[in-house]
Amino acid sequence: MAKDDVIEVEGTVAETLPNAMFKVELENGHTVLAHVSGKIRMHFIRILPGDKVTVELSPYDLTRGRITYRYK
């Protein structure tokens, strides 16, 4: 899948799940299951419930995503 095929949306972390997975509530009201991208994991950036994040969604499965940025 090409990098420019992804859909980027903003949301808020609602719940922390095992294995670095998170339930993220998007601004449009939907809830997606998201995992942490490699760069965030590599730099030990902590993500807690209530944090505002950017999520990349695949156009093929809009229920799963990847957290690519945590706002300060």
From Swiss-Prot:
Matches recorded under InterPro entries: NA-bd_OB-fold, RNA-binding_domain_S1_IF1, S1_domain, TIF_IF1
Residue list for modification Phosphotyrosine: 60
UniProt keyword list: Cytoplasm, Initiation factor, Phosphoprotein, Protein biosynthesis, RNA-binding, rRNA-binding
Subcellular location: Cytoplasm
A cellular-component GO term for this protein: cytosol
Keyword Phosphoprotein: yes
Principal location: cytoplasm
Pfam families assigned to the protein according to its UniProt record, in alphabetical order: eIF-1a (PF01176)
Job description of the protein: One of the essential components for the initiation of protein synthesis. Stabilizes the binding of IF-2 and IF-3 on the 30S subunit to which N-formylmethionyl-tRNA(fMet) subsequently binds. Helps modulate mRNA selection, yielding the 30S pre-initiation complex (PIC). Upon addition of the 50S ribosomal subunit IF-1, IF-2 and IF-3 are released leaving the mature 70S translation initiation complex.
Assembly behavior: Component of the 30S ribosomal translation pre-initiation complex which assembles on the 30S ribosome in the order IF-2 and IF-3, IF-1 and N-formylmethionyl-tRNA(fMet); mRNA recruitment can occur at any time during PIC assembly.
Similarity section: Belongs to the IF-1 family.
Protein name as annotated: Translation initiation factor IF-1
Taxonomic lineage from the root: Bacteria, Bacillati, Bacillota, Bacilli, Bacillales
